[in-house]
A protein has these predicted regions:
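Short beta-strand/loop element within the Bergerat-fold HATPase_c
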Residues: 72-89
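Short alpha-helical Gxxx[C/S/T] motif in the catalytic ATP-binding
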Residues: 131, 135
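Conserved catalytic submotifs in the C-terminal HATPase_c
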Residues: 9-14, 31, 36-46, 82
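Short helix-loop "hinge" at the ATP-lid/N-box region of the Bergerat-fold HATPase_c
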Residues: 65-66
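A residue-level detector for a conserved hydrophobic packing site
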Residues: 54-55
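Conserved glycine-rich
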Residues: 35, 143-144
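Short conserved segment of the HATPase_c
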Residues: 102-116
Length: 161
């Protein structure tokens, strides 16, 4: 165990189990918000990470998705082992969903602290615009990254640990 960036306690964790546990409550949240959560979590994925921080990333991404995904849509969460190159292990967490309106020119700004693609949404959906900036900060503190891409009406967030 070692003390990582930003005070995280980094240990070897069963990432598959941590992601599954953090995602489980969002199945009912998604249903209550008129959506459905579908998960594809590879078994046996491990990472050198802070378990509480990983759970926070999953919770922030799924809270965001359940708030902003199109009514009746499926939110897809997946976790798989990946490679950072030179044999160094990594994991990739992906959350993807349909949205009513994709903020085309604003995608890169979604990770900016306090940024909101549509300021009128705060009164409808809540939130303060900090969640995705926290996701990126946690990913980077773990030596990884967080990115977003959009195609058509589909938005996909990818976090690498």
């Amino acid at each position: 165990m070692d003390e990582g960036s930003a005070g995280f306690t980094m240990t070897s964790i069963a990432l598959s189990e941590a992601v599954d546990k953090a995602a489980a409550p969002f199945e009912s949240v998604a249903v209550s918000r008129g959506k459905r959560l579908s998960t594809s979590i590879a078994s046996g994925v491990r990472a050198h990470a802070d378990a509480a921080a990983v759970a926070q990333v999953v919770e922030l991404l799924l809270d965001n998705a359940t708030r902003y995904a199109s009514e009746g849509s499926v939110i897809e969460l997946s976790l798989r082992a990946a490679s950072r190159g030179q044999g160094k292990g990594a994991a990739e967490l992906v959350v993807s969903n349909a949205v009513d309106e994709l903020p085309e020119g604003d995608l890169d700004r979604l990770f900016d602290r306090f940024y909101r693609a549509d300021v009128s949404r705060s009164s409808k959906t809540g939130g303060s615009g900090v969640g995705l900036s926290v996701v990126r900060a946690i990913a980077e503190a773990h030596g990884g990254s967080a990115s977003v891409c959009g195609h058509g009406n589909q938005i996909t967030f990818t976090v690498r640990f």
